[in-house]
Amino acid sequence: MRNTNPCQFFFLQMNRLYPFFIIGCLLSCNNIEPAKPPEVAVVKIPEKIDGKVAELLQITNKYVTENKGKLNDSVFLLHADLLNKIYEEGDFHPIWSSDEKWNSTADSMYSLVHDAKLYGLFPSDYNFPSLANIFSGMASDSLHKKNAALWARADIMLTDAYLGMAHDLKLGRLVKDSVTIRVDSLVTDSFFVQHFQEALAQKNIRGSLEQLEPKLKGYTDLKAAIPAFLDSAQLKKATYVFYPNKDSASLMKQVAARLSELGMVQAAGDTGLLREGIRKYQKQNNIPVTGRIGEKTVNSLNNSDWQRFKRIAVNLDRYKLLPDTLPHQYIWVNLPGFYLQLWNDDTLALESKIVVGKPLTRTPLLTSKITDMVTYPQWTIPESIILKEVLPGLQKDTDYLKKKGYSLTNDKGDEVFTSSVKWAKYKKGIPYKVIQGSGDDNALGILKFNFNNKYSVYMHDTNQRYYFARSSRALSHGCVRVQQWDKLAHFLISNDSLNAAPNVNTFKTDSLKAFLKRKEKHVIPVRTKVPVFIRYIGCTGINGRVKFYDDIYNEDKMLSERYFSNKPVI
């Protein structure tokens, strides 16, 4: 190496580095960005513009596919692979225009995107701002009509908008959960492509999309109430008030900003005026007038029209998780609405107030079937309640069960004296059952409805019937207390008689009355197993108006933030 002159040394080093140079070049070639479609491609002869649009559609499809759906900084296409398939099958001919003119299907599709909120959808999800710019430009500027790049861009955006709306109207945007029971094995990508092609052939864009919507009464009633809601709604982003908030200055600042948006506070930083604004707001919204910031006031402030619209969107999508048709008989329990409905052949046979679980002991969402009824039931306290309430109570006072009217038994059913147990050693449960005997004071009341579920919950009467007079009834340990339990029981018994085979003896309502009069415990099988749907529907449509329920478990808020938090107001 010492005898090597500088030139020889240079070439030796280059020979060593050359392979790495080649590899680097190859890697950089693989990272070359796809060719971007032109922003402008003017065609002066109208008869030739469709050919240029087809050429640009091929380039645009390739670019979007390789660029993972991104067309430019403001346009993202969610169905790039399907778009390529659709346009490739049509030799990349434009779908929505011809000879510098939109066809009728384009006008219909654009109108649907514009009116997406009427379906509980967000126009921005279907690139409405970019489409609006192109459509308005075409209408006002003849030079725009000669720009084949604009026609190609709009064409692919309209097709993507159809596919997006079709998916969202059919399946919704919520991820399936543990109670989702619809079967969508047939709803594949090819389903939406075929549906799109049929819509074009029949020139019925709106009808084809509306055909995909649920036909369930709850969905159609809520959707029908959206126009009236939008007519009076002020859809604009609002300051969100975080509560509780350890930073009192920050809390006051957020409240002041929100009240200012509502026109109730003008002077920033004036504590006296802010208190007055809070009082004024509380009075207008039927909140106890205190001038102080509390949970009810904050919940109301955060319930802006934009937040309400997002709740509508969430709840419309909840219906899309149900089967296309419901059974001809079923029990529908809506937790935030605090009601139970019994439907029989599309007729509301019974509606009852209910009491549901507290936020800390929520009633679970589930689907099941009524299996039997029990008169004068005893209550075996669930493990969850033992851990949260009973065990801490016993560790403080061994007479806790006696005061509650409960008894303690071992696995053989023998009663155990609470004073004989060292409760301090138990942390995660106890090897005993805690039971409340049957009777008028039993928490289950005098009748219980059983249905199979993994949560050990059921529906029942209650010894606290005064709860039904309250407007907010999230008060139980998780089971559903039914005010009209007697009417529900009579329906189930009569229903069994109607569906029984000839000459088959069935249970009679007179027998139920006798059991209850004698205060006897009996298990009454239900032969016609009526389905039970326990669901969380935060708003419903009633007589053309949206009725919003208190978001008792914050489920609407959670889903709105998860799926729709960054949606722009359009």
Across the structure, where does each feature detected by a protein language model lie?
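N-terminal secretory signal peptides that target proteins for export/translocation
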Residues: 1-14
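Sec-dependent signal peptide recognition
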Residues: 15-22
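C-terminal motif of bacterial Sec signal peptides marking the signal peptidase cleavage site
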Residues: 25-28
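Cationic-aromatic interfacial patches
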Residues: 30-189
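Well-ordered beta-sheet/strand-loop patches within structured domains
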Residues: 30-90, 163, 183, 200-570
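Long, highly charged low-complexity segments enriched in Glu/Asp and Lys/Arg with interspersed Ser/Thr
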Residues: 193-195
